[in-house]
């Protein structure tokens, strides 16, 4: 302690500044590694990959073999092309669910394969319909309506096995009842995709004294206010007439449905896989930061090269370990046939510019001070300080490379794996 107190005043101030800077950077680095999950709001889905496929993907990511990852995922996503998407149509009895299914399929109620319709309750048990010409590999399930019995919404949904469906369409007409609100609350809690469809708009227009725009606005406002009061986020809302399947919101409904079917079949499974990849990359980054042998090998080179060269060599090492070096990226680009994806690894000069923390840690003043501490007069006393600071820089580079790997892999998977979306 006597030695420290006898330090020249300007050196002591520099040392104090250095310690404060180290503590500040440590606070900055720590929360950065706690990345936000990309799919926190992902819808629940029955269309998931097998544990064996997930294990193979995770192993390839850990090995840094992104080309192998893309190959496995591509085969997996292609196998989803014939996944049968299950859509449930539900609501209060008498809301016109069966008529809606017929209109969605562009068939009349008099046709042989149509869902039975009528004034009295016609659907007493779940019935499955399809429309291969408009919605291939999609099951449209006409569920018995709520409200005919004293059955609670919870027991009704359990009986209908609602958790097995990929998308739920809540049909309403005349009034948006408490049952509709309860259905919406439950769908949100279960993280299910769902729509609200207001049918029989033709009847509303024929009996209302309000102009059409005002009536439509009033219906929409009433539904949204009821949902907001129940703290339900705004779902897609469509106002339609089953007798006019080409007018009002019906075309928009079909377009939205086609896109969501595509998402259920392809995008949702890919997002789940991407989250697995992200987690494996994060785990690998954590292991590398704790790898003492790797740090010692890199540290051994400090005496023969300056800090910048040492950190640049570290960047190249980490990129090879994660599979995002120039050679690996070029292989990925060639194998996917998408050279425009980019086959250039992150460069050191770009690395410094893209992260303010690393730029601060590599500034002239810090490097000069580290060199001062390495002199023969200081080495024995302050070696632990310089080693700690260098380790923090390497750990930060590992985190940056890991995040860059996540971004690059997600883009490569999206560009090379997803089939063209139906518009």
Curated annotation (Swiss-Prot):
Q: What induces it?
A: Expression is induced in response to IFNG/IFN-gamma. Expressed in response to Toxoplasma gondii infection.
User: What is the superkingdom listed in this entry's lineage?
Assistant: Eukaryota
PROSITE patterns membership: G_IRG
Chief localisation class:
endoplasmic reticulum
Question: Subcellular location, in the record's words?
Answer: Endoplasmic reticulum; Cytoplasmic vesicle membrane; Lipid droplet
| Record's catalysed reaction(s) | GTP + H2O = GDP + phosphate + H(+)
**Residue numbers binding GTP:** 92-99, 117-121, 200-202
For this chain's UniProt record, which GO biological process terms are given?
A: autophagy; CD8-positive, alpha-beta T cell differentiation; cellular response to interferon-beta; cellular response to type II interferon; cytolysis in another organism; defense response to protozoan; innate immune response; negative regulation of PERK-mediated unfolded protein response
**CDD domains to which the protein is assigned, alphabetical:** p47_IIGP_like
Leader sequence range is none
- What PANTHER family would the database entry show? IMMUNITY-RELATED GTPASE FAMILY M PROTEIN 2-RELATED (PTHR32341:SF6), INTERFERON-INDUCIBLE GTPASE (PTHR32341)
Q: What does this protein do?
A: Immunity-related GTPase that plays important roles in host resistance to acute infection by protozoan, such as Toxoplasma gondii and Leishmania major. Acts as a dynamin-like protein that binds to intracellular membranes and promotes remodeling and trafficking of those membranes. Acts predominantly to restrict acute protozoan infection: expression is required in both hematopoietic and non-hematopoietic cellular compartments and is dependent on Stat1. Only plays a partial role in the control of latent Toxoplasma infection.
State the similarity comment.
Belongs to the TRAFAC class dynamin-like GTPase superfamily. IRG family.
Please identify the protein, giving its name as recorded: Immunity-related GTPase family M protein 3
| Organism annotation | Mus musculus
Q: What is the lineage of its organism?
A: Eukaryota, Metazoa, Chordata, Craniata, Vertebrata
Q: Which gene encodes it?
A: Igtp
């Amino acid at each position: 302690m006597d030695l420290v107190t006898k330090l020249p005043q300007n050196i002591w101030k520099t040392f104090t500044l250095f310690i404060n800077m180290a503590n500040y950077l440590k606070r900055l680095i720590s929360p950065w590694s706690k990345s936000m999950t990309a799919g926190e709001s992902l819808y629940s889905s029955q269309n998931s990959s097998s544990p064996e496929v997930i294990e193979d993907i995770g192993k390839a990511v850990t090995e840094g073999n992104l080309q192998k990852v893309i190959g496995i995922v591509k085969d997996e996503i292609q196998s989803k092309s014939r996944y049968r998407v299950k859509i449930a149509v539900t609501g209060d009895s008498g809301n016109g669910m069966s008529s809606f299914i017929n209109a969605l399929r562009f068939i009349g109620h008099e046709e042989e394969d149509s869902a039975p319709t009528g004034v009295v309750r016609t659907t007493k048990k779940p019935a499955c319909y399809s429309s291969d010409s408009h919605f291939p590999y999609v099951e449209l399930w006409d569920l018995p309506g709520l409200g005919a019995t004293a059955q609670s919404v919870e027991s009704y949904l359990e009986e209908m096995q609602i958790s097995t469906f990929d998308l739920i369409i809540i049909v309403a007409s005349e009034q948006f009842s408490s049952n509709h609100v309860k259905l919406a609350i439950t769908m949100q809690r279960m993280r299910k995709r769902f729509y609200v469809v207001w049918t029989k708009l033709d009847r509303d227009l024929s009996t209302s004294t309000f102009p059409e725009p005002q009536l439509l606005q009033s219906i929409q406002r009433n539904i949204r206010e009821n949902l907001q009061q129940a703290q339900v986020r705004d779902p897609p809302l469509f106002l339609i007439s089953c007798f006019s399947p080409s007018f009002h919101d019906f075309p928009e409904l079909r377009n939205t449905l086609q896109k969501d079917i595509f998402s259920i079949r392809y995008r949702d499974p890919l997002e789940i896989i991407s989250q697995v990849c992200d987690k494996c990359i994060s785990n690998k980054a954590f292991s590398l930061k704790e790898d003492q042998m790797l740090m010692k090998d890199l540290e051994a080179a400090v005496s023969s090269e300056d800090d910048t060269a040492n950190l640049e060599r570290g960047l190249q090492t980490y990129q090879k370990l994660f599979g995002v070096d120039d050679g690996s990226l070029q292989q990925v680009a060639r194998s996917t046939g998408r050279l425009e994806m980019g086959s250039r690894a992150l460069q050191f000069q770009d690395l410094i510019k893209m992260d303010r923390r690393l730029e601060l840690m590599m500034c002239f003043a810090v490097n000069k001070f580290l060199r001062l501490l390495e002199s023969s007069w200081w080495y024995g006393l302050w070696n632990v300080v310089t080693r700690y600071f260098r380790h923090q820089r390497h750990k930060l580079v590992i985190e940056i490379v890991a995040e860059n790997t996540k971004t690059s892999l997600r883009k490569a998977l999206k560009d090379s794996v997803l089939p063209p979306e139906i518009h």
